[in-house]
Amino acid sequence: MTDVLVVVKVFPESDEVNLDNLYEEIGKKLPAGYKLVRKETEPIAYGLKALIAYVQMPENVEGGTDTLEEIINSIQGVSHAEVVGITRLGF
Protein backbone atom coordinates (compact mmCIF):
# COMPACT_ATOMS: atom_id res chain seq x y z
CA MET A 1 0.00 0.00 0.00
CA THR A 2 1.23 3.47 -0.81
CA ASP A 3 0.47 6.97 0.41
CA VAL A 4 -1.14 9.96 -1.24
CA LEU A 5 -0.34 13.64 -0.89
CA VAL A 6 -3.47 15.67 -0.28
CA VAL A 7 -3.56 19.44 -0.74
CA VAL A 8 -6.11 21.07 1.56
CA LYS A 9 -7.14 24.73 1.41
CA VAL A 10 -8.11 25.90 4.90
CA PHE A 11 -10.13 29.09 5.23
CA PRO A 12 -9.81 30.76 8.65
CA GLU A 13 -12.80 32.31 10.44
CA SER A 14 -11.16 35.74 10.36
CA ASP A 15 -7.92 37.54 9.61
CA GLU A 16 -7.11 37.38 13.33
CA VAL A 17 -6.56 33.60 13.22
CA ASN A 18 -2.83 32.78 13.41
CA LEU A 19 -2.16 30.42 10.48
CA ASP A 20 1.03 29.03 12.04
CA ASN A 21 -0.89 28.01 15.17
CA LEU A 22 -3.67 26.60 13.00
CA TYR A 23 -1.13 24.48 11.10
CA GLU A 24 0.25 23.12 14.38
CA GLU A 25 -3.26 22.33 15.63
CA ILE A 26 -4.00 20.40 12.42
CA GLY A 27 -0.85 18.35 13.00
CA LYS A 28 -1.98 17.47 16.54
CA LYS A 29 -5.43 16.30 15.35
CA LEU A 30 -4.23 14.03 12.55
CA PRO A 31 -4.57 10.28 13.19
CA ALA A 32 -1.69 7.79 13.06
CA GLY A 33 -0.35 7.34 9.53
CA TYR A 34 -1.05 10.95 8.56
CA LYS A 35 1.58 13.68 8.57
CA LEU A 36 1.89 17.30 7.59
CA VAL A 37 4.50 17.76 4.89
CA ARG A 38 4.42 21.46 4.07
CA LYS A 39 2.39 24.66 4.26
CA GLU A 40 1.82 27.77 2.20
CA THR A 41 -0.49 30.76 2.42
CA GLU A 42 -2.67 32.16 -0.32
CA PRO A 43 -4.25 35.63 -0.30
CA ILE A 44 -8.05 35.55 -0.47
CA ALA A 45 -9.32 39.13 -0.06
CA TYR A 46 -8.97 42.20 2.14
CA GLY A 47 -5.93 40.89 4.00
CA LEU A 48 -7.46 37.46 4.64
CA LYS A 49 -5.23 34.51 3.77
CA ALA A 50 -5.98 30.81 3.36
CA LEU A 51 -3.67 28.11 4.68
CA ILE A 52 -2.62 25.53 2.10
CA ALA A 53 -1.66 22.34 3.97
CA TYR A 54 0.02 19.36 2.33
CA VAL A 55 -0.90 16.14 4.14
CA GLN A 56 0.59 12.71 3.49
CA MET A 57 -1.90 9.94 4.28
CA PRO A 58 -2.52 6.26 3.48
CA GLU A 59 -4.14 5.65 0.11
CA ASN A 60 -6.77 3.15 1.21
CA VAL A 61 -8.48 4.89 4.11
CA GLU A 62 -12.17 4.33 4.72
CA GLY A 63 -13.90 7.62 4.01
CA GLY A 64 -10.98 8.82 1.89
CA THR A 65 -10.28 12.52 2.08
CA ASP A 66 -13.73 13.26 3.57
CA THR A 67 -12.39 12.15 6.94
CA LEU A 68 -9.46 14.55 6.63
CA GLU A 69 -11.79 17.44 5.75
CA GLU A 70 -14.01 16.62 8.75
CA ILE A 71 -11.02 16.61 11.12
CA ILE A 72 -9.78 19.98 9.89
CA ASN A 73 -13.26 21.53 9.82
CA SER A 74 -13.72 20.59 13.50
CA ILE A 75 -10.76 22.73 14.60
CA GLN A 76 -11.51 26.04 16.27
CA GLY A 77 -10.66 28.96 14.00
CA VAL A 78 -11.44 27.07 10.78
CA SER A 79 -14.32 28.40 8.71
CA HIS A 80 -14.07 25.81 5.96
CA ALA A 81 -11.56 23.31 4.56
CA GLU A 82 -11.62 21.64 1.17
CA VAL A 83 -9.38 19.25 -0.72
CA VAL A 84 -8.04 20.99 -3.82
CA GLY A 85 -5.59 18.35 -5.02
CA ILE A 86 -4.43 14.80 -4.51
CA THR A 87 -1.58 12.78 -5.98
CA ARG A 88 -0.26 9.30 -5.42
CA LEU A 89 3.21 8.91 -3.93
CA GLY A 90 5.37 6.00 -5.05
CA PHE A 91 4.34 2.98 -7.07
Curated annotation (Swiss-Prot):
InterPro entries: eEF-1beta-like_sf (IPR036219), EF1B_bsu/dsu_GNE (IPR014038), Transl_elong_EF1B/ribsomal_bS6 (IPR014717), Transl_elong_EF1B_B_arc (IPR004542). Keywords: Elongation factor, Protein biosynthesis. It comes from the Archaea. CDD domains: EF1B. One of its GO terms (molecular function) is translation elongation factor activity. It holds the Pfam family EF1_GNE. NCBIfam families: aEF-1_beta, PRK00435.1. Belongs to the EF-1-beta/EF-1-delta family. Promotes the exchange of GDP for GTP in EF-1-alpha/GDP, thus allowing the regeneration of EF-1-alpha/GTP that could then be used to form the ternary complex EF-1-alpha/GTP/AAtRNA. This is Elongation factor 1-beta. It comes from Sulfurisphaera tokodaii (strain DSM 16993 / JCM 10545 / NBRC 100140 / 7) (Sulfolobus tokodaii).
